[in-house]
């Protein structure tokens, strides 16, 4: 390194000397030129300067919107506790140990960067990084697992880049300050997340290392959004069906084998060209998506969290990026190296080579060869000594001395100087800063909102794009919470214009999924229901302009399928709706599950009502030991015979095929009863189809009303948002206050001021009792009069001010602006309200004053201290 530095300095010195010589030759040549040439050059230079000034004046500088700065100057440290502003003796000792450790490390590893040991906190006090961690278990069950903790930290805080991307920060703030201002760099993110994970029981560590450009800048534009990744579909292996011995042989293939081979070759060429085109297109897209080379690759400082296996049933080690909350394998290429890591008990330096990023690192912190620790007494067990190393420790005295030496060198980590980390329920519910956060992914944009921030209950929206520039929208997914209509997800496909609504259980119509392109009736739509919440067991209803298909489950009549075909609607002269003028039914097909209580030859599997053709077709279930099923068809005839009588039933009106014919099925009476039963069933089926059409209309009308209202539900335990609970609580508080005033009034002693004028303990005479009574009543009467006069004075004052304002308005009415008129009208309205209230108070006071006077007089007569009055009126 020293040789390379000297070589670079020599080259720079040679370049400076060469530049000085060129400047000297140019000056000499200029002096030797004629005066005219020099004048022309000066003129040209002036014109060039004027042209340059003109062009520069046309340039407008636009200040780019930078990320909000988060520095110590923006933090209010006046209310911080003493532990933030000073160090305890134990912390000072720890800082000395850390400085000594850093000096030894710099001496032994001069090529390594300085250690990140004790940065300054928000009060400019150096604090050891391990004491900045405050293990805390949050009181929210959602924050008990690592994934929810990481997602909360990612959503709650706003990322601020490091001041110098090549160095760790000079300040490391406490987690309480970071939570208060909701901003921080990667080290602040990691400190907060690691504190929460350790409190939840994970073996977590803060890492000081190097990351990729995307990782350090929280750039997810080359990452696929996790919400767009579809789960892998399990491919079921098709079981090979063994050919039966007596199967029918297929007919002989008479097609030309040569033509088939040529067609196969042609198809293979087409597929090869298509595959080549797709490969070229994929390479082009990969080239476009490829990140530009980073000049600082491998040098950018980043901090993240390492979670080791063992605790909380973690099967293997993994990294957590605190910016995004995503987990990564320790082999991931985004993490380029590790300098050191720490938890709340110790500090470790990585002594392994990171030439292959973090792929070859072994995270055995008990191995002092790979991980150099700072403090003894760590909870990580040391490697066991081999037999060769153990041979030198044979004597008991040596073992005792070794134990004493370790005991003397051990040093316990001081307690954290950070206050208890607390997250209020309001902050936990709001999550994102100001309640909103936007994350840009590769071909996708994710927006998040706090619950109840949007009036329609929208909490998240995922927009998927077709191109990398995010201009052509493919689909939109919107997630909702606390909706009264139980709407949970809305999926909009911009390519097909198909909208799909997903509902949670509890909708009035038991909706589960509603797919549609238009809310107009008799259009293509699919409605799925929670069949257990419906009486009829309807699972799904598919509708087109000419058909309606319904699927059932769990019905007592074993109905599983109903398909209705409609004909063109008959035009009417008057205006008609779908309800008053239903579509004519052409055909109804119904299918049934097997009813084990009936024999197969009597259990109908499918029945078809051909309404227009006046035919009914039946197909029965097939017995297990048969390969064919019985069938029957009924013809409804409206003709009359030769005598003019209506034909009820003839043998040709029932065409049947029976696997095992029976005598009673051939009788006309049996066939007649079966046809009459089917006619009733047809009428019932047509009515049910009509009811289904009406139900669709009701659902569409209800959905339009719900979308227009988008009412949100509020829990009865949410006292801040629940208006009914709030009104009830305020009413109870008002009643308690009034009751308190009544108690104070009843306990008020009216005679106390007058009795104080007499000698204590002296018994009142008759004359003194009468005088006290008269004085008390006179004083009370005067107070009632004063109160009436006060109300009257306020009333007159308000009236005079209103009259003056009205007079001013009459004088300046022409020159007033609309804003002045609005202010005048508002003042008049408020003044009239005050005048009316004062008038009501005065009238009420006039009505109640005599009653209060009489009540006090009666109370004085009954007062035991004025017993002489009772003798007078006895």
UniProtKB/Swiss-Prot annotation:
Judging by the UniProt lineage, the source's domain of life is: Eukaryota
Indicate the principal place this protein occupies in or around the cell. Answer: other
Region annotation Disordered: where it falls in the sequence: 1-20, 386-410
Cellular compartment(s): Cell projection, Cilium, Flagellum; Cytoplasm, Cytoskeleton, Cilium axoneme; Cytoplasm, Cytoskeleton, Flagellum axoneme
User: Coiled-coil stretches, from where to where?
Assistant: 1-67, 257-297
Biological process terms from the Gene Ontology for this record are: flagellated sperm motility; sperm axoneme assembly; spermatogenesis
Kindly give the PANTHER family that the UniProt entry links to this protein: DYNEIN REGULATORY COMPLEX SUBUNIT 7 (PTHR35249:SF2)
Summarize tissue expression: Expressed in the testis.
Residue stretches of biased makeup (Acidic residues) = 386-400
The record's section on InterPro entries has: CEPT76/DRC7_peptidase-like_dom (IPR056290), DRC7/lobo (IPR033551), DRC7_C (IPR056292), MORN_DRC7 (IPR056291), Papain-like_cys_pep_sf (IPR038765)
Instruction: Show the GO cellular component annotation of the record.
Output: cytoplasm; cytoskeleton; motile cilium
UniProt record similarity statement: Belongs to the DRC7 family.
* Known partners and oligomeric status: Component of the nexin-dynein regulatory complex (N-DRC). Interacts with TCTE1/DRC5. Interacts with DRC3 and GAS8/DRC4.
Regions of biased composition (Basic and acidic residues) lie at 401-410
What is the name of this protein? Dynein regulatory complex subunit 7
Query: Which UniProt keywords are listed?
Result: Cell projection, Cilium, Coiled coil, Cytoplasm, Cytoskeleton, Differentiation, Flagellum, Spermatogenesis
Note the SS bond partners: none
The record's function comment reads: Component of the nexin-dynein regulatory complex (N-DRC) a key regulator of ciliary/flagellar motility which maintains the alignment and integrity of the distal axoneme and regulates microtubule sliding in motile axonemes. Involved in the regulation of flagellar motility. Essential for male fertility, sperm head morphogenesis and sperm flagellum formation.
